[in-house]
From Swiss-Prot:
Residues 654-666 have a biased composition (Basic and acidic residues). Residues 650-678 are annotated as: Disordered. GO terms for molecular function: 3'-5'-RNA exonuclease activity; magnesium ion binding; polyribonucleotide nucleotidyltransferase activity; RNA binding. Residues 622-715 form the S1 motif domain. Belongs to the polyribonucleotide nucleotidyltransferase family. Signal peptide: none annotated. Its cofactor is Mg(2+). Gene3D superfamilies: GHMP Kinase, N-terminal domain, K Homology domain, type 1, Nucleic acid-binding proteins. One of its GO terms (cellular component) is cytosol. This is Polyribonucleotide nucleotidyltransferase. GO terms for biological process: mRNA catabolic process; RNA processing. InterPro entries: ExoRNase_PH_dom1, ExoRNase_PH_dom2, ExoRNase_PH_dom2_sf, KH_dom, KH_dom_type_1, KH_dom_type_1_sf, NA-bd_OB-fold, PNPase. PROSITE patterns: KH_TYPE_1, S1.
Length: 717
């Protein structure tokens, strides 16, 4: 049965519809906001897997080109593998939804939001999020919903709910907030040095509308009736001999948890578990069914030990206090032939960033339903398996794309405008070691490598990952969390920024009782930590170098009138090709008359610039040129002043420096005098040798008539 509900959110109505499309799915919702429409479906498999310690969820957001009235570019006219944007939106949908599924359900779950229409004004990602959340909530899959999402922008000192693409582009803050009726579950976005209070107010603003959308979803239950949920695959089980296991390993496991060094600590914990496993095996108390429960009980003890130590003793497994940051080492210029390089090491997390400068030809072309784009800044994050001491495939996964995007957003607000710095910039982060917060280490190393490459960034940027351990009575906020603190904790909050404010952030919350005061405390503790990190980075490199690397391509720009573009290009590109070949430069001509020269030799680039300026320059009487003799006849010579301009040097014209002789003496007159065997050359002919085609001669413009014809005379040195 078709049901439709709508709610005013910002400038448009959010329309949710179910019962018309994809009725064989476990759940399906069509969401529309303005002219953007997304269909989201959810299905689960029939096969059941017991004792899973994770939710087998996959989210596959996809955009159809027909949604914008386009046909895919390139040779293949079918949508192919997911684009980075689709991966990022899939992660936005996945992260707030995953904790609300019951692990005991034991079946694979697939959520597929598909953009069917877009007005290229209202971003379809936020529409897809609400479509997916509603589809899952209305399905027969056990889910602790409802949840909803809202985007907030801050522009001209005002908050805008679900802003347009143009408003996002002009804003100083762009965040996506997801949450339930119980509280915020996820925040992600970028900013241009905004304060912590503005961020908190934006989250507050978003939550007001999130609750309204959640209530709208609940209205569907009254309209269509609550569906009977599918049964859980298994009941929660515990290890039968858990008390005996606690008595056997608890204190030994506690000692192992506080061994210094990630690898040593993991090895010590593994040894304790192995000894316990052998003990229970010898008593024949382990079998295939309860072996998983045995290891789960060990993990529960480990989590209890770590959390209790932090809450009661303010002591973390590596010996730090909650606010303490690991030792930091920062270096630049490790790689001599690169354009800029930096190494940032924080404890057992290490990121090597390399900046490469290219030309506009190196820009990333994006064929997108929201409009074609060219990106002149890219950050690529690589997380090889050796960074955590493991083997595996070297490939770019969703995690790498997501972490790279967060680091890129954190840095891009500090980059110069393209008109001021017309380079394409690529930063590659190689994570060489990882024990928590590698994306924030990427921000730090990336910022320093940009400065080392000579990119005129506005401010240094640093990042830090915050964590949370809480119970019913108290909470402890952790600075610079380890990997295990991320796994065992209640919150992962990454904050990047400058000394002036925040530029990037990502928060995932696993509990429902996070208050505004808690977030304020976390942001303030993150700000203090960020200032500490910035001070260390500034001691190594505090501002961009005045010049770019000698290994980077050089750029020279000039502006010409639009109506002169054709002169620079020439017939069939002849002129611009000649400039390219002669001076070994690459020439890019924009429609607004801006010309950019790329090359490696400064002298040749300046000569190429002078050549172009001479081509477009309007000739004036009295100007002197080094012209090329193109053709000679009995009346004089045609002299090429520039590839697009010629003048005529008459044999009757007189030089300003010689009133008695003609400027040109044609060869036949010379031969006539020589027939008599004597040199009858006049004084002026001896002073001015014969001109030959191809000869370079210095000439002066003596006159320009009303038709633009140029008359020349020889110019004396």
């Amino acid at each position: 049965m078709r049901k439709i509900l709508k709610l005013k959110i910002g400038r448009e109505d959010l329309i949710l519809e179910t019962g018309l499309l994809a009725k064989q799915a476990n759940g399906a919702v069509l969401a529309t906001y303005g002219g953007s429409t997304v269909l989201a479906t959810v299905c689960c498999s029939d096969s059941i897997r017991e004792n899973l310690d994770f939710v087998p969820l996959s989210v596959e957001y996809n955009e159809k080109y027909y949604a914008a009235g386009k046909i895919p570019g390139g040779f293949i006219k079918r949508e192919g593998k997911p684009k980075d944007k689709e991966v990022l939106v899939s992660r936005l949908i996945d992260r707030p939804m995953r904790p609300l599924f019951d692990k005991r359900f034991g079946r694979e779950i697939q959520v597929v939001p598909t953009t069917l229409s877009t007005d290229q004004m209202n971003p379809p990602d936020i529409v897809g999020m609400n479509a997916a959340f509603t589809a899952v909530f209305l399905s027969d899959i056990p889910f602790n919903g409802p949840i909803a999402a809202v985007r907030i922008a801050y522009l001209n000192d005002e908050f805008i709910v679900n802003p347009s693409f143009d408003e996002i582009q002009d804003s100083v803050l762009d965040i996506v907030v997801a949450g339930s009726l119980d509280g915020i579950t996820m925040v992600e976005g970028g900013a241009n040095e905004v304060s912590e209070e503005i961020l908190l107010d934006a989250i507050d603003k978003a939550y007001t509308y999130i609750k309204q959308i959640c209530d709208l979803q609940k209205e569907f239950i009254y309209l269509i009736g609550e569906r009977e949920k599918l049964p859980l695959a298994y009941e929660e089980k515990v290890f039968e001999f858990k008390d005996d296991l606690r008595s056997l390993i608890y204190f030994e496991l506690k000692d192992a948890c506080f061994v210094r060094g990630k690898l040593n600590r993991d090895k010590a914990i593994k040894l304790v578990k192995q000894k316990a496993y052998e003990h229970f095996s010898s008593l024949e108390q382990l079998n295939d069914e309860n072996e998983i429960l045995f290891y789960k009980a060990c993990d529960d003890f480990e989590q209890e030990i770590v959390r209790k130590s932090i809450l009661e003793d303010n002591l973390r497994t590596d010996g730090r206090t909650p606010t303490q940051i690991r030792d930091i080492i920062a270096e630049v210029d490790l790689l001599k032939r690169t354009h800029g390089s930096a190494l940032f090491t924080r404890g057992e997390t290490q990121a090597l960033a390399v900046t490469t400068l290219g030309t506009s030809i190196d820009e990333q072309v994006m064929d997108d339903i929201d409009g074609d784009k060219r990106l002149n800044f890219m950050l690529h994050y690589n997380f090889p398996p050796f960074s955590v001491g493991e083997t595996g495939r070297l490939m770019t996964g969703r995690r790498e794309i997501g972490h790279g995007h967060l680091a890129q957003r954190s840095l891009e607000a500090m980059l110069p405008k393209k008109d001021d710095f017309p380079y394409t910039i690529r930063v590659v982060s190689e994570v060489l070691e990882s024990n928590g917060s590698s994306s924030m280490a990427t921000v730090c190393s990336g910022s320093m490598s940009l400065m080392a490459a000579g990119v005129p960034v506005k401010e240094q940027v640093a990042g830090i990952a915050m964590g949370l351990i809480s119970n019913d009575d108290k909470y402890v906020i952790l600075s610079d969390i380890l990997g295990e603190e991320d796994h065992l904790g209640d919150m992962d909050f990454k904050v990047a920024g400058t000394k002036n404010g925040i530029t990037g952030f990502q928060m995932d919350i696993k509990i429902s009782n996070v208050t505004k005061q808690l977030m304020r405390d976390a942001l303030e503790q993150a700000r203090i930590g960020r200032m500490h990190i910035l001070s260390i980075m500034d001691s190594v490199i505090s501002s961009s170098r005045g010049d770019i690397s000698v290994n980077a391509p050089k750029i020279v720009q000039l502006q010409i009138d639009i109506d002169k573009i054709s002169l620079v290009i020439g017939s069939t590109g002849k002129t611009v090709k000649a400039i390219t070949d002669e001076f070994e430069v690459r020439v890019q001509i924009e429609q607004d008359g801006r010309i950019t020269l790329f090359g490696t030799d400064n002298l040749k680039m300046q000569k190429a610039k002078a050549k172009i300026e001479s081509i477009v320059r309007e000739p004036k009487v009295g100007e002197i040129y080094d012209g090329i003799v193109k053709k000679i006849n009995s009346f004089g010579a045609f002299i090429e002043l520039t590839p697009t301009k010629e003048g005529f040097l008459s044999n009757r014209s007189r030089s300003r420096d010689d009133r008695y002789g003609s400027d040109i003496r044609h060869s036949r007159y010379s031969n006539r005098h020589s027939r008599y065997g004597r040199d009858n050359r006049s004084s002026f002919s001896m002073r001015f040798p014969r001109l030959e085609e191809g000869q370079i001669v210095k000439v002066r413009i003596s006159d320009i008539d009303k038709f633009g014809k140029i008359e020349l005379e020889l110019a004396r040195d």
